[in-house]
Amino acid sequence: MESTIGIDAGGTLTKIAYLNKKMQLAFEKVYSNEQNKIIDWLKNQTGIKQICITGGKAKQLQQLLSASYKIVELNEFEATLVGVRYILKKEKYDINNFVLTNIGTGTSIHYIYNDQYIRAGGTGVGGGTIMGLSKLLTNIDHFEDVIPLTKVGSRKELDITVGDIYGGILSPIDNSLTASNFGKAAITDSNYNSSDILATIQGLVGEVVTALSLQFAETKNIDHIIYIGSTLCNNIHLQNIISSYTKYQNKTPIFLRDGGNSGAIGALLYATNKKS
């Protein structure tokens, strides 16, 4: 049986969406610099005739695959939006207007109004920042190793909070808010363990991304912020940071199951609908 798959070739990860033998949506993830593994996986699948590719490395991957498969290319954000709409419907959300924050290697932020979207902005702070700083500060360079260590880490010895600055005096804002990420590292001589450093890195990234998302949401008076991206996958620590900060500013955070695969899902759906 002929089949179609969707591929989101990102800066760090390449995500693949396809229908398995039970005709259920399934996913694969491969590091984008391991293109031989992507090719090997495709060779092991039977009946693939068409591939819809999206993402920053789409052109590069297309050159490798075009001789063997029919290739359809789709704009990265169009693919992501199709995928997000599909997941929202599947998870029974009825939301038409929202801010969509996609935390990949970097972070992009869009306004969504029904079927229209406008790029609000973005930041170079994202998953690539987590991995880059993790490598520099702890010599840990695999996301799968970062997550469990982060879970047992604490930011108390590294971040300066508002409460630390005011020292028990009534402050104008919540004492638990971060005044300076990693600020204590400059004023103490402690040796910090890897878990605490990793937790603090994620705190920095989470707060920067959330603060920017909140500013955009407030500007347009939008209540819901949907956070997606592979950086959030199994990353409860980062989700909690983003969620608590978003709620503190009276906005509603939403984390979609399989949100990190939105682009690949959208590519699959686009190619499937176009084919039919």
From Swiss-Prot:
Q: Which InterPro entries match?
A: ATPase_NBD, Type_II_PanK, Type_II_PanK_bac
Q: GO cellular component annotations, sorted alphabetically?
A: cytosol
From the UniProt record, list the coiled-coil ranges: none
Top-rank taxon: Bacteria
Q: Does the keyword NADP apply?
A: no
Q: Where in the cell is it found?
A: Cytoplasm
Question: What reaction does this enzyme carry out catalytically?
Answer: (R)-pantothenate + ATP = (R)-4'-phosphopantothenate + ADP + H(+)
Question: Keyword Nucleotide-binding: yes or no?
Answer: yes
Q: Which residues form the active site?
A: E76
Q: Which GO terms describe its biological process?
A: coenzyme A biosynthetic process
Q: Name one GO molecular function term.
A: pantothenate kinase activity
Q: How does it assemble?
A: Homodimer.
Q: What is the role of the protein in this entry?
A: Catalyzes the phosphorylation of pantothenate (Pan), the first step in CoA biosynthesis.
Protein family (similarity comment) = Belongs to the type II pantothenate kinase family.
HAMAP family, per the entry: Pantothen_kinase_2
Q: What is this protein called?
A: Type II pantothenate kinase
Q: Which species is this UniProt entry from?
A: Bacillus anthracis
